[in-house]
């Protein structure tokens, strides 16, 4: 690792100007980086150490960089070469070469540098002083010249104006005299003596005025001429001063040259040598410190070697762990793949089973619904036909109980609909009428009772129609039935005016139908006003009071136990048909929402009619007759015989058929229960499979988390590896920068040479401009009073003492500059970037020049004051 060779790959480090590189095992320095006209892309111009190149820094007549002339003239041949970045390699010198830079060579280079710096500083200060003096003299010359020219031009203008005015006045006087002569000659014989005297007086006054103005103009002209003469004299004096000042300037230049020679002679004195020896001691101490740092760096290199070995061992172990983890991960992935395949297969089977079970479940639901419908119908028929069992033949009491049963069935179902309320109340009314007819058949009154019964059974209450509608659960409109009931009651006055029948019909209407009708109107209508709500509440309360009154009238104590009967007063014309027409027409069968309020008002009228009816009811005692008792006994005997003869066979057959149907239904229900149990078992199996799948997913997630943790550990180890590599590279870079600081010193010297050439060229241009202005010999006055006060250099001894004092101060400044300069102290323990070096170097150099300029001004002022 300590031989000359490549330090780092060029792709990892940026190549810049003045870097030492290798091109095909040839050492050289980078002098150009950029695009060229002979080929595309970025090319690197290299100045080789040996004449093994292909050109002298130019190609196709275009120069891209310069080669050292001494090298080219002494050895001959070409030192230039153009190449790409890929062929370049950084050059790292051997430790043997580095060890040759011992203390003696460093001291010699330091002495040479200090001598060059002092000479450059003295020359530069001298040139700066000359430059400043010449600039000030040029500025003063230019200002005085402009002032004088402006004054002369102003005076010339005044003289010209006065001459013009004088000529105008003369011409004006001549013209005036001619006019006077002409007027005198023309008007002399005509005018009187008085007028002539007046005119003469006027002309005399005008003449006096013109003389006064002429005298004033002449005085002004004389003053201007005097001023002009004075200015000309001043101009002559100034021109003499300029010539004298030119001679003084030459003398000052000579004195400045003598001073520069004396400063150069004194710069080689012992003080500067002592300071240089001190600087040499400092440099040796710095070199020792650098050697100590090199030893520390070598120890660090050994540590880095040990770290690298441990890192390689760790890397091998981690790679083994990685391979093991990858194999385990692949196995787990295979297991997860099998689990996923099994999961997908189970999902497919589950979906097929669910589809089948859903289809079977739907079919079973249909069967269950049909069976429930059939069971409902069978129960309805069973209960319906059980009503006939106590009777031997069809009986009105049985019909009443059948209608009552159907009313209870419709009440147990959805009673919120208006149609159900309608059917319920009609069935209640028909049941009450059939029971009343049954009572009348027992009493065998009136005469035409048979036709009335036949009409009621066939037209009013056809039980077969009601039974078929209940079995199919499809009910037709019953408005015609309601009106036919009212018509039937009107035709049969004994029923229409039967108070007991009226009360028995009104009781269920007021107890169940009216509250549900009010609730229906309240919920299914948009009644938001308080008046309507109060009306519904009052109607409900009135229905409750009416029910209480009806209960009192038809109570067991008043009717059944005592031989009393209810009658209406003859003046009362209220009948059952009139009450039912009010109820059926407007209150119950009104289906328009906007007419609900009118239906409530009709209900109020209905309640008023019931109240008036109840007020007209009276109770009278009734004498029992022998005929009625005989007829009742005969009817009972007939009924018993008839029921025993007809119903026995028919009921037996019906019971047998119903039992068979029930057995079939029970078998079907058992089959359905077994199928449902099978479906439940399959559902449990499906749930267990889903739970297994969930557990497998949880295990997979845990494995994935473990893999993520292992990958994070691997990433951390990779980062540590990367950081160690970067540290090693940084250490190598530091070593390279410590060994490459000599090249930076050379760059600094080149930059100083360039600055010196620029300053010299600027000063030469200023000298040429001053000489050109002196040759033109313009008449300008320059104030060089400060040069008149310069002392003559006759007393050599005090002047030399002061020069020695100034040289001491200059030596102190040089020591400070050398101690702060980057040439002596490059801070080798802290590697700097090249841009930073250029910036700090320029900054320190500029600050040094400013300090020197200021000190030279102070010295010149001190010299002048000393000799005053």
From Swiss-Prot:
GO terms for molecular function: microtubule binding. Keywords: Coiled coil, Cytoplasm, Cytoskeleton, Dynein, Microtubule. Its main location: cytoplasm. GO terms for cellular component: actin cytoskeleton; cell tip; cytoplasm; dynactin complex; dynein complex; microtubule; microtubule associated complex; spindle. One of its GO terms (biological process) is establishment of mitotic spindle orientation. SMART domains: CAP_GLY. InterPro entries: CAP-Gly_dom_sf (IPR036859), CAP-Gly_domain (IPR000938). PROSITE patterns: CAP_GLY_1 (PS00845), CAP_GLY_2 (PS50245). Motor-binding component of the dynactin complex which assists cytoplasmic dynein by increasing its processivity and by regulation of its cargo binding. The dynactin complex is required for the spindle translocation late in anaphase and is involved in a cell wall synthesis checkpoint. Component of the dynactin complex composed of at least ARP1, JNM1, NIP100 and ARP10. Dynactin comprises a short rod of the ARP1 filament attached to ARP10 at its pointed-end and probably associated with the capping protein at its barbed-end. The rod is implicated in dynein cargo binding. A sidearm formed by NIP100 projects from the ARP1 filament and is implicated in motor binding. Present with 238 molecules/cell in log phase SD medium. PANTHER family: DYNACTIN 1-RELATED MICROTUBULE-BINDING, DYNACTIN SUBUNIT 1. This is Protein NIP100. It comes from Saccharomyces cerevisiae (strain ATCC 204508 / S288c). The gene is NIP100.
């Amino acid at each position: 690792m300590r031989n000359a060779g490549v330090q780092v790959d060029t792709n990892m480090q940026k190549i810049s100007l003045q870097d030492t590189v290798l091109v095909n095992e040839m050492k050289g320095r980078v002098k150009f980086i950029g695009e060229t006209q002979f080929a595309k892309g970025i090319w690197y111009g290299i100045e080789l150490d040996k004449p093994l190149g292909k050109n002298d820094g130019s190609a196709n007549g275009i120069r891209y960089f310069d080669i050292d002339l001494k090298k080219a003239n002494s050895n001959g041949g070409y030192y230039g070469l153009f190449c790409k970045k890929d062929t370049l390699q950084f050059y790292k010198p051997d430790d043997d070469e580095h060890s040759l830079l011992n203390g003696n060579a460093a001291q010699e280079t330091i002495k040479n540098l200090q001598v060059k710096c002092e000479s450059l500083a003295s020359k530069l200060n001298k040139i700066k002083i000359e430059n400043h003096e010449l600039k000030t003299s040029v500025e003063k010359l230019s200002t005085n010249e402009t002032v004088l020219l402006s004054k002369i031009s102003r005076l010339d203008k005044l003289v010209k104006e006065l001459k013009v005015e004088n000529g105008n006045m003369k011409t004006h006087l001549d013209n005036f005299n001619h006019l006077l002569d002409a007027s005198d000659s023309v008007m002399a014989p005509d005018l009187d003596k008085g007028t002539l005297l007046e005119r003469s007086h006027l002309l005399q006054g005008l003449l006096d005025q013109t003389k006064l103005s002429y005298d004033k103009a002449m005085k002004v002209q004389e003053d201007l001429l005097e001023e002009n003469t004075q200015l000309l004299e001043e101009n002559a004096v100034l021109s003499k001063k300029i010539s004298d000042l030119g001679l003084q300037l030459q003398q000052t230049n000579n004195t400045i040259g003598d001073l520069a020679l004396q400063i150069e002679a004194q710069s080689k004195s012992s003080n500067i040598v002592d300071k240089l020896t001190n600087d040499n001691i400092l440099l040796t101490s710095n070199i020792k410190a650098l050697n100590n740092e090199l030893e520390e760096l070598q120890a660090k290199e050994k540590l880095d070697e040990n770290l690298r070995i441990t890192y390689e061992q760790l890397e091998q172990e981690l790679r083994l762990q990685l391979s093991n983890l990858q194999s385990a991960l692949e196995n787990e992935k295979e297991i997860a793949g099998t689990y996923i395949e099994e999961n997908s297969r189970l999902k497919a089977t589950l979906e097929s089973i669910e589809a089948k079970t859903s289809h079977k479940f739907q079919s079973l639901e249909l069967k269950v619904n049909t069976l429930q419908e059939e069971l409902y119908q069978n129960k309805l028929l069973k209960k319906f036909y059980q009503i006939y069992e106590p009777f031997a033949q069809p009986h009105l009491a049985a019909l009443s109980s059948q209608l009552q049963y159907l009313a209870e069935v419709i009440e147990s179902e959805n009673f919120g609909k208006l149609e159900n309320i309608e059917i319920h109340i009609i069935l209640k009314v028909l049941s009450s009428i059939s029971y009343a007819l049954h009572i009348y058949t027992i009493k065998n009154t009136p005469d035409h009772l048979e036709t009335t019964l036949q009409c009621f059974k066939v037209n009013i209450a056809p039980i077969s129609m009601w039974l078929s509608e209940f079995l199919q659960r499809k009910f037709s409109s019953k408005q015609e039935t309601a009106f036919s009931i009212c018509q039937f009651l009107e035709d049969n006055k004994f029923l229409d005016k039967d108070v007991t029948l009226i009360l028995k019909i009104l009781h269920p209407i007021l107890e169940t139908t009216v509250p549900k009708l009010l609730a229906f109107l309240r919920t299914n209508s948009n009644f938001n006003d308080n008046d309507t709500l109060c009306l519904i509440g009052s109607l409900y309360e009135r229905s409750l009071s009416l029910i209480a009154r009806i209960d009192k009238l038809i109570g067991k104590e008043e009717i059944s136990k005592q031989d009393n009967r209810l009658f209406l007063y003859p003046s009362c014309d209220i009948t059952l048909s009139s009450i039912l027409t009010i109820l059926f027409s407007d209150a119950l069968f009104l289906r328009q929402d906007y007419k609900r309020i009118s239906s409530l008002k009709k209900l109020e009228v209905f309640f008023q009619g019931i109240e008036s009816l109840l007020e007209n009811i009276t109770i009278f005692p009734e004498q029992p007759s022998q005929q009625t008792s005989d007829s009742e006994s005969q009817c009972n005997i007939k009924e018993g015989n008839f029921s025993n003869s007809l119903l026995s066979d028919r009921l037996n057959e019906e019971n047998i058929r119903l039992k068979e149907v029930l057995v079939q239904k029970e078998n079907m229900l058992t089959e359905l229960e077994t199928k449902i149990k099978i479906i439940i078992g399959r559902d449990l199996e499906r749930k267990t499979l889903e739970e297994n799948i969930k557990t497998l997913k949880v295990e997979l997630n845990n494995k994935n988390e473990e893999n993520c943790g292992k990958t994070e550990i691997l990433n951390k180890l990779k980062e540590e590896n990367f950081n160690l590599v970067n540290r090693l590279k940084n250490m190598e870079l530091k070593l390279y920068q410590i060994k490459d600081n000599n090249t930076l010193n050379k760059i600094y010297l080149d930059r100083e040479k360039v600055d010196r050439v620029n300053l010299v060229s600027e000063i030469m241009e200023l000298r040429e401009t001053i000489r050109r202005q002196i040759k033109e010999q313009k008449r300008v006055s320059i104030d060089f009073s400060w040069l008149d006060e310069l002392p003559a250099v006759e007393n050599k001894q005090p002047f030399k003492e002061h020069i020695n004092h100034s040289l001491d101060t200059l030596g102190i400044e040089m020591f400070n500059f050398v101690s702060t300069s980057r040439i002596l102290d490059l801070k080798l323990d802290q590697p700097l970037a090249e841009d930073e070096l250029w910036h700090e170097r320029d900054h320190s150099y500029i600050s040094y020049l400013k300090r020197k300029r200021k000190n030279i001004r102070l010295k010149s002022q001190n010299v002048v004051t000393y000799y005053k």
